[in-house]
């Protein structure tokens, strides 16, 4: 049910091409949702020794919006706002990784604990696990910019931790299908009808 973009450690144009390819696969199949994160360069300036410095929050906002702007409008895609910092036990180091797997994980956890037609966002169901911090924590103004551009902000909320704070699909028009839970409900119904 999920297509993950994975790491987006490519130049922006290559990462956008990969994202559009995943969206086209999801649109063709109509039984999956593609989860997409921006390219790493939107947040980090990597040095030759493998360490990176973070861009400013204003730059990150414009970089993230710029990354998603040319992507195909689709209710079968979910766009998130960034990267989390976590411990990689296999390499015994901390690193930034994209959140697309975590956003898909909130949907999977929601399927187990609730139903696909419940929103995977918010403090009750949108918790991002195993994260030390975020590369980018948008403030209210930045969240408004992101959300109006089809991008689901992931934020740190005192008392709640790191949470998915939006439930939009990548659909570019106001519609019932611009919500993750509505798209997933219709996928669930179509599968149930075809199995009957």
Predicted region positions:
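A glycine- and small-residue-enriched flexible loop/hinge signal that marks low-structured segments
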Residues: 1-196
